[in-house]
Every structure is written in structure tokens, then in C-alpha cells.
Amino acid sequence: MDESDLYRKWMRLVENLEREGIIKSEKVKRAFLRVPRYKFVSDRYKEYAHVDEPLPIPAGQTISAPHMVAIMLELAELEGGMNVLEVGAGSGWNAALIYELVKREVYTIERVSDLVEFARKNLERAGYKDKVHVIWGDGSKGYPPNAPYDRIIVTAGAPKVPEPLIEQLKVGGKLLIPVGSYHLWQELLEVIKLDEDNNTKIKNHGGVAFVPLIGEHGWRE
């Protein structure tokens, strides 16, 4: 399947997500059209990139289903110039979408070294080499060198909200994170930092299924 066929199928998926009310804003739609998922999966999975399901990536991990990525990006309410940290680089796809929404360098942190390399290669091929920085480290600790953040988006499920992530938010900043069980079921939480004492307001957006967040402030291996 050549790239024009892949892109036509991708456009149809984006239109379906918009019709279903999952993609709500023109800016998220525009980002999805600029950053098709097939550029961030292995060759054997490119023909399935338009299917609204998770797909395998290296190290036993997955690239999220497009509808889940769209839901989180809409909830994030990203604006131009925002400082954003992503926890869990995976394939690099979500970080590239974030860049398209904020038009500012994005930092994404990943603990699995094979995925660090996978994401970096994908981002370089897609034209984001100097726009998205993939850091190797424990994402449950955040990334203090570039804090404070307007938004932190976590793409793995935690047992509880990691305190370092709240500490690294700006007052008024937002954290999106799945919290719940180790496997298969969490609740997507929207956490707003209210003050410098790290008081928060939390909204529950319902059930989701993500791989576990492994780290000092996440799950143990």
C-alpha cells in the first residue's frame, strides 16, 4: 500500500472521529491530519494504522487507539506556546501531535531504552527531530529541568497520582493521567493545580485501559 492510499484511509478515520464527536476542535483535527499514525508504527503495521485500535510497538508496548489520543488532546486544551511534558514517549506519535498544537519544543520522557530509540527515529523521519526531545528516564518523577509545565500528559496507568508531577505543574496547570489497576482498567483523571501548596481539583473522565506506569512513583517492575 503506497503512502497516498495510507493517507486517504487516515483521512477517513479522522473524519469519522469528528463525526462521532470525539474530535471536537478544528485544531485537534488539523494536528491529526498533519501527523498520521502510520508514520509512527513498524512497516508491518502501517496498513492497519487507520484502524481505531491500539497497535503493537517494540518492547511489548502499544501505540494508543486514535480515539483515545484525541480524547486526551481535547481534554488537555492545548494552546500555542504552552510548556508540555509527556510521560511515556512510546512511538513518538502523541508528542508530535502535541507539538503541532503548541508549536513549542515538547519534552517526552520514556523509561524503555528501545522505545527511546524507536521514538527518536520516528520523530526524525517525520520532521520533528529538533521539535520533540525524547528523554530516557523515570517518567513518574517528571522532568524537573524543563519545569514548571502548563500541561503534563501521562500515557500509562499509575496506582495513584505521582506527587512530583503535581509539583512540576504551574499553578492553574493541568495533569491528565490514568489511575487504577496495573492491568487493563484505570480511570482518566484531570488534575488541576490550585496553588503552590499543591492542592488540586480532580475530575474523573471515566474508564480507560493503558499499559502500567513503571517507576519510583508508579508501579514496581
Curated annotation (Swiss-Prot):
Active-site residue list: 64
Reactions performed catalytically: [protein]-L-isoaspartate + S-adenosyl-L-methionine = [protein]-L-isoaspartate alpha-methyl ester + S-adenosyl-L-homocysteine
CDD domains: AdoMet_MTases
Enzyme class per UniProt: transferase
GO molecular function, one term: protein-L-isoaspartate (D-aspartate) O-methyltransferase activity
Keyword annotations from UniProtKB, A to Z: Cytoplasm, Methyltransferase, S-adenosyl-L-methionine, Transferase
InterPro entries: PCMT, SAM-dependent_MTases_sf
Compartments where located: Cytoplasm
EC number: 2.1.1.77
Keyword Cytoplasm: yes
This protein's GO CC annotations: cytoplasm
GO biological process: methylation; protein modification process; protein repair
Gene3D superfamilies: Vaccinia Virus protein VP39
Domain of life: Archaea
Function according to Swiss-Prot or TrEMBL: Catalyzes the methyl esterification of L-isoaspartyl residues in peptides and proteins that result from spontaneous decomposition of normal L-aspartyl and L-asparaginyl residues. It plays a role in the repair and/or degradation of damaged proteins.
Assigned protein family: Belongs to the methyltransferase superfamily. L-isoaspartyl/D-aspartyl protein methyltransferase family.
Record protein name field: Protein-L-isoaspartate O-methyltransferase
Native species: Thermococcus sibiricus (strain DSM 12597 / MM 739)
